[in-house]
């Protein structure tokens, strides 16, 4: 199974991505975790990433695509992947789709977790992970960035017949079951 997870900050992409990965026996690749790992190792790339993460801004496409596609290609040996937090823009999606098609590992589905703004605000306030990118100001900015840059991806993936919309406001288990039902229909 090869799945891309989309949704605003606080929609549950990480939680649901891990559940999908566990159910289908494939790696869960989180762009946020890859970025935070790179920052923790204090590489030059990590230092560059840190500036963008601290501000809640999108990381430049060339940097993101390189990091993510290296990991996706490595993960494909495990029979697929669940990718969460990437792509965030149509140009990223186009570049990733080309690289994946060239490697014969195109996404089978794009799961979009829909959550009302008031629920997102509550979730981000309650998350309590201690992440710098969860402060109220940065969280608001991340939601604005999502709306401006990521929402066009919904049209992009709808036109390609890949988008699966899931109401992610119910409890976690109910959301997982809705996702599994949709993916099981795709996976046959």
Residue ranges and their predicted role:
Residues 1-188:
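Glycine-rich phosphate-binding loop of ATP-dependent small-molecule kinases
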């Amino acid at each position: 199974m090869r799945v891309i997870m989309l949704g605003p900050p606080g929609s549950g992409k990480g939680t649901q991505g891990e559940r999908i990965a566990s159910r289908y026996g494939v790696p869960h690749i989180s762009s946020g975790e890859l970025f935070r790992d790179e920052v923790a190792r204090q590489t030059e790339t990590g230092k560059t990433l840190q500036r963008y993460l601290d501000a809640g801004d999108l990381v430049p496409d060339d940097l993101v695509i390189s990091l993510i596609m290296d990991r996706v290609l490595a993960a494909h040996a495990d029979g697929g992947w669940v990718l969460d937090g990437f792509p965030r823009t149509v140009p990223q999606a186009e570049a990733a789709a080309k690289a994946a098609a060239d490697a014969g590992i195109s996404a089978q589905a794009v799961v979009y977790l829909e959550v009302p703004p008031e629920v997102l605000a509550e979730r981000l306030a309650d998350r309590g992970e201690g992440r710098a990118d969860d402060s109220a100001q940065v969280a608001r900015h991340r939601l604005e960035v999502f709306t401006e840059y990521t929402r066009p991806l919904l049209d992009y993936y709808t036109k390609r017949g890949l988008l699966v919309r899931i109401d992610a406001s119910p409890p976690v288990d109910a959301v997982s079951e809705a996702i599994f039902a949709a993916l099981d229909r795709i996976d046959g």
